A protein has these predicted regions:
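Phosphate-handling catalytic cores of nucleic-acid transaction enzymes
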Residues: 2-289, 295
Length: 295
């Protein structure tokens, strides 16, 4: 809970006390056991930032796990008589100055995969444009000869792995539909970005996030989508966010809607430390930390 503006009312005092209780709780939250890191597969083991502190390692590890869950679309399991993919939601919560940006390692893992998917989509669009132009020419000649036009080529879906956090309800639905069994991920180190979009009139996609987590069908028929309604069967979505406690409160205003129970929360509070510019650490940008792609 966030600190409220000063007021003599009892509610403000209660909110203030709850805020500091939360901050004290964050100081005592445990780190992942060392045994977790001891038996990691090589792919994950190579992603561990050994020179960082325990909190940074944990946050980076959670980021990597969430990212990898989004690129295993052919992997499934059964839980409570339901079929689930590995996709899951996680949220790293800590005050400002806690080095939460280290969680970008998960995004770096997927950048090359995302670029590969975009390149394929752009190539398919160019191929379609060529076929469509040729189809129009053929139709012109066929009409002059009083012959039937050939079937119009089908426009391919434009796929991408990352769903932008700045989006609308309809745009998110369309992209999840276009991605199909490939799946998607929302990855943003500023939870406020998604919270702001969710509060817009064109947003309000809490229900879609809840359904996607459970792989429940998502249907809609808005005017903006044209005559054909949108049907998404077995949606697959992963989500990783980091932010401050107030950003979490802005995104998850109440537990009654059910979204909090679907998110893995990792919260902590640590003493901010200055990192000198002349340290010996190496860059962990996507040029050094990427998944292999089958081209």
């Amino acid at each position: 809970m966030t600190k409220a503006t000063y007021s003599p009312s009892e509610n403000v005092y209660e909110a203030d006390e709850a805020y500091w209780q939360g901050e004290e709780f964050r100081k005592e939250t445990p780190c992942f056991p060392k045994s977790v890191y001891k038996y990691l597969p090589d792919l994950l083991n190579e992603c561990i930032l050994e020179e960082e502190g325990d909190r940074e390692q944990d946050l980076s590890f959670l980021s990597n796990l969430t990212a990898l869950s989004s690129v295993l679309p052919a992997t499934f399991g059964i839980y409570n008589h339901k079929k689930y993919s590995p996709h899951f939601y996680s949220f790293g919560i800590a005050p400002a100055g806690s080095n939460k940006s280290i969680a970008q390692t998960g995004r770096y893992l997927l950048e090359e995969v995302h670029d590969w998917i975009l390149s394929n989509s752009e190539l398919q669009q160019k191929t379609y444009n060529h076929k469509y132009t040729q189809w129009k020419l053929d139709c012109t000649y066929k009409k002059k000869a009083h012959e039937e036009c050939p079937e119009e080529p089908e426009k391919p879906a434009y796929k991408m792995l990352f769903l932008p956090a700045t989006t609308s309800y309809s745009r998110m639905q369309i992209q999840m539909r276009d991605n199909g069994p490939q799946g998607s991920i929302i990855f943003d180190t500023e939870a406020q970005t998604l919270a702001t979009a969710n509060h817009l009139d064109c947003g309000n996609f809490d229900d879609m996030l809840r359904k996607a987590f459970e792989h429940e069908n998502i249907d809609s028929a808005f005017k903006i989508n044209g005559l054909a309604p949108i049907y998404i069967r077995f949606p697959m979505l992963a989500m990783f966010l980091t932010g401050t406690p107030s950003q979490m409160a802005s995104l998850i205003e109440t537990s009654e809607k059910g979204l909090p129970s679907r998110i893995m929360l990792y919260t902590f509070r640590s003493i901010p430390k200055w990192k000198p510019m002349g340290d010996d650490s190496i860059s962990v940008s996507y040029t050094h930390l990427t998944l292999p792609t089958n081209r």
